[in-house]
Amino acid sequence: MRAAGTLLAFCCLVLSTTGGPSPDTCSQDLNSRVKPGFPKTIKTNDPGVLQAARYSVEKFNNCTNDMFLFKESRITRALVQIVKGLKYMLEVEIGRTTCKKNQHLRLDDCDFQTNHTLKQTLSCYSEVWVVPWLQHFEVPVLRCH
């Protein structure tokens, strides 16, 4: 116990005489833009966000029995987190298009439904995990209502 008290006193003495860690060291850490493990708000028009939103829509289209394809109409919120790749957390509005699933068209070429009986918009929350160096993506969470 006495050795621990001596060590504590020595550390306090050193820090008080040296002034502790330099302010530059602390400010570099605090000013870091993205810290591993912490979600950070990102612009909704960021290319990575747009691609992650498209992955979400593709998963939605593959999981539903709707005869028409949906595509993203608006990304309302986007977060990114560094976790063995990038994890995007997105709030996206998706809309039914005029393209039928069996037509295999590019989603960018599909217009949104204007027919009131066929028009449908859903709000979705998705998490998309992207590992760029492995060209791997996964959509573990997708909820639409």
UniProtKB/Swiss-Prot annotation:
Gene3D superfamilies on file: 3.10.450.10
Motif Secondary area of contact per UniProt: ranges: 81-85
GO cellular component: cytoplasmic vesicle; endoplasmic reticulum; endosome; extracellular space; Golgi apparatus; late endosome; lysosome; multivesicular body
Tissues and organs where the protein is expressed, per its UniProt entry: Primarily expressed in peripheral blood cells and spleen.
One GO MF term attached to the UniProt entry: peptidase inhibitor activity
InterPro entries: Cystatin-F, Cystatin_dom, Cystatin_sf
Alphabetical GO biological process terms: immune response; lysosomal protein catabolic process; negative regulation of microglial cell activation; positive regulation of myelination; regulation of antigen processing and presentation
Subcellular localization, as worded in the UniProt entry: Secreted; Cytoplasm
Pfam families tied to this protein: Cystatin
Signal peptide: 1-19
Glycosylation sites: N62, N115
S-S pairs: C99-C110, C124-C144
Keyword annotations of the record: Cytoplasm, Disulfide bond, Glycoprotein, Protease inhibitor, Secreted, Signal, Thiol protease inhibitor
Site (described: Reactive site): G37
Assembly description: Homodimer; disulfide-linked.
Family recorded in the similarity comment: Belongs to the cystatin family.
PANTHER family named among the record's database cross-references: CYSTATIN-F
Described function: Inhibits papain and cathepsin L but with affinities lower than other cystatins. May play a role in immune regulation through inhibition of a unique target in the hematopoietic system.
Protein name: Cystatin-F
Lineage start: Eukaryota, Metazoa, Chordata, Craniata, Vertebrata
